[in-house]
């Protein structure tokens, strides 16, 4: 049997009793998962990003069970994913490392040139950032796997997005879901946008990652695995940044 204990990054106190019980800390009650009957030298399990895990082993055979091993600490890093080139609109150019989206200046297209990222598991907190290069109109957000590829991001009940569109005097950030919208106007155009998909807290947040400021927060009980989604409406490029630890401004949001 191999118990697996999870610990939050901000977990501050712990105590083990009889090898199977862990007390509640000031912040979070840790939980255990056990895997019995492991017959191969390896076992694959899904772990949440930005979490500390304690692994314990105990051997079992017809003659009895061994003592539980000492804890092995494994700390996971931030969510990492790539763009799915097969989902890209023909007008978009996707880099060989599947992290850069480009819409050429003279590209001719109909509809909304979009592309999806790899599917994120429906648990934990996922954070990524987008660096904007000379693109004045774009959409970034998430959509459930069941979302129709022909639909427009943010105009149905299975997608949520931030739509950046310039005006004569400012930049308008429009937050869309099922076609309903909320507008935020800013005088500067952030070149780095952060997105936090928080399944645990039921939130989707968009940040000005340069200044560490929340642009918009959506409260919703997200239930399904989701694709990060991107659409360019004007020429330019978006670069995807993943695998990072949660910035302090995200932890405190």
Where are these regions (language model features)?
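Beta-rich ligand-recognition domains in immune and ubiquitin systems
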Residues: 1-253
């Amino acid at each position: 049997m191999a118990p697996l204990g999870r610990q939050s990054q901000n977990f501050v106190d712990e105590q083990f009793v009889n090898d199977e019980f862990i007390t509640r800390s000031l912040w979070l009650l840790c939980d255990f998962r056990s895997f019995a009957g492991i017959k191969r030298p390896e076992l694959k399990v899904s772990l949440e990003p930005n979490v500390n895990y304690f692994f314990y082993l105990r051997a079992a055979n017809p003659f009895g069970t061994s003592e539980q091993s000492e804890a092995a600490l494994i700390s996971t890093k931030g969510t990492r994913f790539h763009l799915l080139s097969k989902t890209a609109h023909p007008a978009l150019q996707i880099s060989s490392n599947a992290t850069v989206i480009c819409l050429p200046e003279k590209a001719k297209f109909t509809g909304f040139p979009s592309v999806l990222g790899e599917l994120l598991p429906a648990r934990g907190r996922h954070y990524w950032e987008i660096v904007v290069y000379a693109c004045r109109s774009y959409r970034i957000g998430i959509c459930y796997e069941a979302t129709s590829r022909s639909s427009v991001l943010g105009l149905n009940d299975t997608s949520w997005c931030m739509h950046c569109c310039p005006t004569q005097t400012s930049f308008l950030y429009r937050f869309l879901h099922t076609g309903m919208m909320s507008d935020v106007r800013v005088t500067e155009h952030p070149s780095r946008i952060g997105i936090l998909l928080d399944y645990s807290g039921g939130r989707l947040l968009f940040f000005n990652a340069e200044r560490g400021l929340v642009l918009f927060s959506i409260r919703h009980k997200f239930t399904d695995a989701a694709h990060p989604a991107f659409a360019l409406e004007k020429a330019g490029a978006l670069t995807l940044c993943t695998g990072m630890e949660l910035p302090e401004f995200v932890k405190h949001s």
